[in-house]
């Protein structure tokens, strides 16, 4: 299969939008605040008249990734598919805010490489909270179900979460407010001339 280029380039779309397409990839334990921070960043960007779109790992499991479970292979495929969706959206000039556990360092690195090959900015943001904090929040009751044996292969309970070693930003979400975390992400986008 051969790639088919159109007449309109990414530069044309970015010029039209007045921003650069990019991906902000929020990673962390379930209950760390990834989606909550992404929602706050989205509100700030849209308030500043910047086009962005949230790609939430849970939401994708209702459609595109509906057929995937939580085994290591399925998690890897979940991250790969999500990365492809983010790459396509970023190529349109949109700022993509992706939030998913993505527990394995190697899979996140593959997504980073995918964006590098497409010459698209990719920023990994680690929403860092201790397991005890994430488990005490448990907004979806997933830790409770995992501890009761109702969910297998759950990150933090049955499988490890591999924290980033070279991410662009670490948010200490156990000690900082959602708003403070969102401000740091927006500032990172400004510093990198995305917005």
Regions found by a protein language model. Give the residues of each.
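Extreme N-terminal, non-catalytic leader segments
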Residues: 1-23
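Hydrophobic anchor at the beta1->P-loop junction of P-loop NTPases
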Residues: 26
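The conserved Walker
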Residues: 30
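Conserved lysine of the Walker
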Residues: 34
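Conserved substrate/cofactor phosphate-moiety recognition/catalytic segment
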Residues: 39-87, 91
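Conserved beta-strand scaffold positions in the cores of enzyme catalytic domains, especially
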Residues: 52-54, 122-124, 168-170
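ATP-dependent NMP and nucleoside kinases share a basic, alpha-helical "lid"
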Residues: 63-74, 84-146, 153
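Small-molecule kinase domains that catalyze NTP-dependent phosphoryl transfer to phosphate-bearing small molecules
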Residues: 128-131, 136-184, 191-195
């Amino acid at each position: 299969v051969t790639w088919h280029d159109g007449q309109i380039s990414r530069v044309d779309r970015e010029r039209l939008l007045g921003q650069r397409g990019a991906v902000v990839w929020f990673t962390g334990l379930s209950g760390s605040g990834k989606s909550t921070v992404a929602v706050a960043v989205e509100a700030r960007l849209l308030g500043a008249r910047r086009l962005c779109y949230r790609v939430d790992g849970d939401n994708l499991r209702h459609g595109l990734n509906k057929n995937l479970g939580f085994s290591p292979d399925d998690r890897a495929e979940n991250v790969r598919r999500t990365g492809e969706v983010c790459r396509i959206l970023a190529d349109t000039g949109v700022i993509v805010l992706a939030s998913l556990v993505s527990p394995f360092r190697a899979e996140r690195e593959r997504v980073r490489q995918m964006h590098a090959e497409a010459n698209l900015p990719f920023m990994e943001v680690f929403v860092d909270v201790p397991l005890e904090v994430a488990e005490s929040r448990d907004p979806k009751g997933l830790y409770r179900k995992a501890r009761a044996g109702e969910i297998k292969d759950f990150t933090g309970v049955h499988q490890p979460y591999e924290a980033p070693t070279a991410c662009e930003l670490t948010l200490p979400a156990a000690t900082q407010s959602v708003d403070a975390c969102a401000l740091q992400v927006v500032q990172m986008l400004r510093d990198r001339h995305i917005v």
